[in-house]
Design a protein with these regions (language model features):
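N-terminal helix-turn-helix DNA-binding core of bacterial DNA-binding proteins
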Residues: 23-68, 73, 79, 95
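Charged, amphipathic alpha-helical coiled-coil/dimerization segments
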Residues: 74-134
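Amphipathic, non-membrane alpha-helical segments in soluble helical-bundle scaffolds
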Residues: 4-15, 66, 103-106, 129
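N-terminal leader segment of winged-helix/HTH proteins
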Residues: 1-35, 158
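C-terminal regulatory/oligomerization modules of transcriptional regulators
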Residues: 1-5, 130-158
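Short, locally clustered residues in the helix-turn-helix/winged-helix DNA-binding domain
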Residues: 19-22, 45-49, 110, 137
Length: 158
């Protein structure tokens, strides 16, 4: 990748990394799930990570329209990657849980992503690799803090 950008705040460098990560995310989903769209896989990921979860929670987590999530989850159900059940506490809600095949699929994509990322990191020298890993850890923590602040009732009130 040719560096044609320079920005003091690092936003352009971060955007370049984001594009590379999205490419990895897309290619690993395509390679491991011929039948799923990226949105369907993202919905399955939320179900695996948050079981049991409602369709509404999946829609909020992915910032998608509930009808889009319903269609994605219907497809996942047809492929036997998730199961649906009525919520015993609220009959208007449907609870979602992954099947064994759904969990295995998410695990397979995760293994492929780890393999690809490890290959990219191996291309860096030891010092650059260690610095990149530390930067990833700090960046992930900063994103988590930013997301937490965004959900804060105090921030929404301002």
């Amino acid at each position: 990748m040719t560096q044609t950008w320079q920005a003091e705040d690092g936003a352009e460098a971060a955007l370049a990394v984001l594009r590379a990560m999205v490419t990895i995310a897309n290619s690993t989903v395509e390679r491991n799930t011929e039948q799923l769209t990226l949105t369907q896989f993202r919905a399955l990921r939320v179900v695996v990570d948050r079981t049991p979860v409602t369709m509404g929670k999946v829609a909020r987590e992915l910032a998608l329209n509930p009808s889009s999530v319903t269609r994605a989850c219907d497809r996942l159900g047809t492929l036997a990657l998730l199961e649906k059940a009525p919520n015993p506490l609220n009959r208007r809600e449907t609870l979602l849980a992954p099947t064994g095949a759904g969990r295995q699929l998410v695990d397979r994509v995760d293994r492929d992503r780890r393999r690809v990322l490890a290959g990219v990191l191996r291309r860096l020298g030891p010092g650059a690799r260690d610095a990149a890993i530390q930067a990833f850890e700090r960046f992930a923590a900063a994103v988590e803090a930013e997301e937490s602040d965004a959900r804060s009732p105090l921030r929404r009130a301002t």
